[in-house]
Amino acid sequence: GQWGASISYAGQMFGLPVRVYMVRVSYDQKVFRRSTMTAWGSEVIASPSELTKAGRDALAADKNCRGSLGLAISEAVEDAINDPNTCYTLGSVMNHVCMHQTVMGLECKKQLAKIDEYPDIVIGACGGGSSFSGIAFPFLSDKLYDEPKAKNLRCIAVEPTSCPSLTKGVFTYDFGDASGYTP
């Protein structure tokens, strides 16, 4: 959704073709987001699709499969693996995306500084981790460098009760996609 829109915009600006695999339930529910991507010239595909083995396997197992982020990632990675002219961009789930996600926290810090404020608590969603790191890391940097304004700072990660990743389950490595393509 948001990453697809960002990449679609960048593709338009630089004259690059973009294909977005969008989770089917989001594809159906977020018509405006999808139309924004297509307006910027992207091909938007509902995942699971018939275009990849990962998509076909998911549809064979459940013809009404609504998709998942992991499955959409699998389809995009598979597409990139099979086409030497294709590059894959990842907007979440992996550690290296934390850097560009910090734009959120940096922007927040700047806006708060304009009104001479600093938060006591920073709260962020945590699933794949990039949204939380995006909002929290710029503030945690202040805490690590013993900035007086950050003395009482608390950063709180909030997870969904339906699929907690911090408080329940097994602490182990998991792939960022459904097919195990990602490291």
Give residue ranges: language-model regions.
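N-terminal cofactor/phosphate-binding cores enriched in small/glycine residues
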Residues: 1-4
